[in-house]
Amino acid sequence: MKNKSPVADPKLIEVLESLSLPIYCGQGRKLFMQGEACNGLYILESGEAAQVLNAASGRTVYCIHTGSGSLLGLPATVGNEPYSMTAMVKKGSKVRFVTRYDFEKLVEAEPQLYPGVMQLLAAEVRSARLALSET
């Protein structure tokens, strides 16, 4: 099942970008794997990505296609949990990385950013539920 991911508020992205480092994705790459320890989130500045959730059997249960303005790995970063999906970006995508530590310090220093983070997480939950209801 495929779905399109919600996009983050441009103000939130702007603040996160100020703390981020560029990630080379010239040939496309896997950013993180389902079950891997979370070390931060990724900002998809341009290009395309897919986030895939697999069952223990290896069967793909859910797939989200993302575009510019998406934050990949946000639920794991906020929850301090392993990544719940695998994220891959296509060749030529522009991606930036924010460490979990830097994200936590930012939200502590600027708590007014939290409503935007929560809205994005809620949109991801709604999107996943809608996709699951279509099966």
Residue ranges: model-predicted function:
Residues M1-T135:
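Cytosolic regulatory regions built on CNB/CRP/Popeye-like sensor folds
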